[in-house]
A protein has these predicted regions:
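Hydrophobic-ligand binding "helix-grip"
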Residues: 31-32, 45-46, 56, 60-104, ...
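Hydrophobic ligand-binding cavity/cleft-lining segments
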Residues: 1-42
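Conserved strand-loop elements at the edges of beta-sheets that form or border functional pockets
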Residues: 13-15, 49, 72
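Conserved short-loop catalytic and cofactor-binding motifs
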Residues: 8, 42-43, 58, 121
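A conserved amphipathic terminal alpha-helix motif
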Residues: 113-149
Length: 149
């Protein structure tokens, strides 16, 4: 973590950049931890490609839970999004994921900003979010490394 408004998570994935980006944006429903979803057992998690696309959890009962909106799409190098997830849109933060080639691996940098708008509650949210991203990014790394090219 860096300051009160920002958190940064960096890690390496033993997979090419294009594969890592694809697993994050096209296969999230296969690896995203169920305990970090609205429904607890979604049918799918979709990152609609391109700026303005939605991030949507689709429940097995046909329900949709909008997690956010794509604000930047530079495949396979970067994706940015307004992150609502389980909160009210007025409490949204911004996330930017950058995928950089480092030899035969991919360095992933996740930067999330906007916690300060929540006032005193921002520090608590940031700490919980930091812990949640640890679980989510570990699951992602395992999936990206297991994915067939």
């Amino acid at each position: 973590m860096t300051d009160a408004d920002t958190l940064v998570v960096e890690f390496e994935v033993r997979a090419p950049v294009s594969q890592a980006f694809r697993v994050w944006t096209e296969r999230a429903g296969l690896w995203w931890p169920k305990g970090h979803t609205v429904s607890g057992d979604p049918e799918s998690i979709v990152f609609e490609p391109g700026v303005g696309g939605r991030i949507v959890e689709r429940g097995r009962d046909g329900s949709e839970h909008e997690w956010g909106e794509i604000t930047a799409w530079d495949a396979p190098r970067q994706i940015g999004f307004l992150w609502v997830h389980v909160f009210d849109r007025s409490q949204a933060t911004r996330v930017v994921l950058t995928f950089a080639e480092v030899g035969t691996t991919t360095r992933v940098r996740l930067e999330q900003t906007g916690f300060a708008v929540l006032g005193e509650a921002g520090a608590v949210r940031r700490e919980r979010t930091w812990n949640a991203w640890g679980v989510v990014t570990s699951a992602f790394a395992r999936a990206a490394e297991a994915e067939e090219g």
